[in-house]
């Protein structure tokens, strides 16, 4: 056992010696300085740990201080609630008191001397967009300027200018027609030129016939005038400068451009050139002061032959007056440039019809119908026995349907047979696409459009409204409306007095066809109250269609006099029930 113990000790010593021999030598770790010679790495780590602790403590103190200040502010608000309320009430009372006593505002003092005050500048006009829709430049030039420019464009080739004709037509139509140029200066007024003058026409050009125009103009209708002026001159070297530049033009230049030259005259030019009726209305005189008085139908020609100006054979008797014509034309042009006469609205041609209406106070008890229409009932029945259709030129005066006050013009429509009826206004609007109206049922019945009226409408003894008193002055209108409904209206010819109408044939008087209402809208009508439950005011009557009884108030009314000629009136109220089969 001792031997084994010594062996172990010996082995341990050998192992320890081997280990000491194999262990390498330790190398010292070099020291790193954060700040060379001042702050090492170990000192830096110690300072960093200390600063982190201070940051944690600072956050805790800031949180504690915020809680304390919040609690203190709440206590302050609680203490200042009453003083704040008192101050707000004081300011409100002071403001209300100031409203009761308004102070005058003196405004700004010395505004003219204050350099900060000044007049606003005019805003600049907006720029017109040439690409905008409807942006088209339009030049409006007066007539006189257009004539001067027109002459200045072509001063060499001066020949003629066709003037226009205005105020021609019938009725209320006013039209302007261009006249074709003529190589003569012609002043035409009724009567037409004689045959001798037409036969003496020289080589200046063909003479146009004017019988058609004179035959179509009416002496008692509207004012119709025919005035043509055209002057032919020699070439530019032989042209007389005293001629009126308003009457010259260049047809050669117009032919080269491919369209005729012309212009629209103003109202002043037409009014100056038109023949006007004098006070007596029996003759025509020329208003133009520049043109001398020429006999009706005389043709004055200025042809250009051989470069010289000479009159034609039709005006050889007035050879000595050519210079006067030129001087008067020049004088007229100078006067036109000096001052243009203004139009007199009272003398302008007006086309209207003044119906002759007689204002009467009709006697409602004796003859209300004759006071309104001016004819006996027997003559009306005789004239009604022979109906006749209206001709294309027949005109019916509106005074036959409703009275007009004197002095009120009534314009006549000149488009075919002018038959006028009073407008029947039912107070119903036409249904639109969005209207929700129910379809018509059997309760609604409209009048048929057949030309033959029902027998009830043509009955000679229709039922009268018993004990009905119309207001004073309305009896004739009520009867006329009833006859229009029944189709027995006779309208006398317009413009004829009572004596003239008696001499005419009653069969020639026009007959009017009563207008028949057509179904243009769907109207549902249902009575809200029964007629028997209504309480009528004194003097008011209502016709009950179902019972054929006239409902009236309790006040008794006087009976009609025996001499009263009250007209029959047909009553067609709205159907409230289904129509009964006949």
Curated annotation (Swiss-Prot):
- Show the ranges annotated as biased composition (Polar residues): 311-320
Annotated spans, Disordered: 1-29, 110-133, 147-221, 310-331, 551-582
> Which superkingdom, per the lineage?
Eukaryota
Composition bias (Basic and acidic residues) maps to 1-23
Q: Indicate where the modification Phosphoserine is found in the sequence.
A: 242
Entries under InterPro entries matching the protein:
DUF4639
User: Keywords for this entry?
Assistant: Phosphoprotein
Pfam families annotated for this entry?
Answer: DUF4639
- Asked whether the UniProt record includes Flavoprotein among its keywords, one would answer no
This chain belongs to which protein, by name? Uncharacterized protein C2orf81
């Amino acid at each position: 056992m001792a031997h084994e113990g010594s062996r172990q000790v010996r082995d341990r010593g050998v192992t320890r010696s081997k280990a000491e021999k194999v262990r390498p030598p330790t190398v010292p770790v070099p020291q790193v300085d954060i700040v060379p010679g001042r702050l090492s790495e170990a000192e830096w780590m110690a300072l960093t740990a200390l600063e982190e602790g201070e940051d944690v403590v600072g956050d805790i103190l800031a949180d504690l201080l915020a809680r304390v200040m919040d609690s203190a502010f709440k206590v302050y608000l609680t203490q200042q609630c009453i003083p704040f309320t008192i101050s707000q009430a004081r300011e409100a009372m002071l403001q209300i008191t100031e409203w009761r006593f308004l102070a005058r505002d003196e405004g700004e003092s010395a505004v003219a001397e204050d350099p900060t005050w000044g007049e606003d500048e005019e805003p600049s006009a907006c720029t017109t967009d040439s690409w905008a829709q409807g942006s088209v430049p339009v030049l409006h030039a007066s007539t006189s300027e257009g004539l001067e420019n027109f002459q200045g464009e072509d001063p060499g080739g001066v020949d003629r200018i066709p003037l226009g004709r205005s105020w021609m037509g019938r009725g209320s139509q006013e039209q302007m027609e261009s006249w074709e140029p003529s190589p003569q200066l012609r002043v035409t007024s009724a009567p037409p030129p004689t045959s001798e003058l037409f036969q003496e026409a020289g080589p200046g050009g063909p003479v146009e016939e004017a019988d058609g125009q004179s035959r179509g103009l009416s002496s008692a209708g509207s004012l119709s005038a025919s005035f043509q002026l055209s002057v032919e001159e020699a070439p530019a070297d032989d042209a007389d400068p005293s001629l009126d530049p308003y009457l010259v033009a260049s047809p050669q230049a117009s032919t080269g451009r491919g369209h005729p030259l012309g212009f629209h005259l103003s109202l002043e030019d037409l009014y100056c050139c038109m023949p006007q009726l004098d006070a007596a209305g029996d003759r025509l005189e020329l208003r133009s002061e520049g043109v001398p008085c020429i006999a009706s139908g005389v043709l004055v020609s200025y042809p250009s032959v051989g470069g010289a100006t000479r009159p034609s054979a039709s005006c050889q008797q007035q050879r000595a007056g050519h210079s006067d014509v030129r001087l008067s034309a020049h004088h007229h042009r100078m006067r036109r440039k000096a001052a243009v006469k203004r139009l007199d609205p009272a003398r302008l041609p007006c086309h209207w019809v003044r119906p002759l209406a007689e204002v009467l106070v009709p006697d409602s008890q004796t003859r209300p119908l004759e006071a309104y229409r001016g004819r006996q009932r027997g003559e009306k029945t005789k004239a009604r026995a022979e109906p006749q259709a209206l001709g294309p030129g027949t005109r019916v005066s509106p005074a036959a349907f409703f009275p007009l006050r004197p002095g009120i013009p009534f314009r006549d429509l000149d488009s075919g047979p002018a038959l006028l009826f009073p407008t029947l206004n039912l107070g119903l609007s036409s249904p639109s696409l969005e209207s929700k109206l129910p379809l018509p049922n059997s309760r609604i019945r409209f009048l048929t459009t057949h030309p033959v009226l029902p027998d009830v409408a043509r009955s000679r003894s229709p039922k009268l409204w018993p004990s009905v008193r119309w207001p004073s002055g309305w009896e004739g209108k009520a009867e006329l409306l009833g006859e229009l409904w029944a189709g027995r209206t006779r309208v006398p010819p317009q413009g004829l007095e009572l004596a003239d109408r008696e001499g005419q044939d009653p069969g020639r008087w026009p007959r009017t066809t009563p207008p028949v209402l057509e179904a243009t809208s769907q109207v549902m009508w249902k009575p809200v109250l029964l007629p028997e439950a209504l309480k009528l005011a004194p003097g008011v009557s209502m016709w009950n269609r179902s019972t054929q009884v006239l409902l009236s108030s309790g006040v008794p009314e006087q009976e009609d006099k025996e001499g009263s000629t009250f007209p029959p009136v047909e009553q067609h109220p709205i159907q409230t029930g289904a129509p009964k089969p006949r």
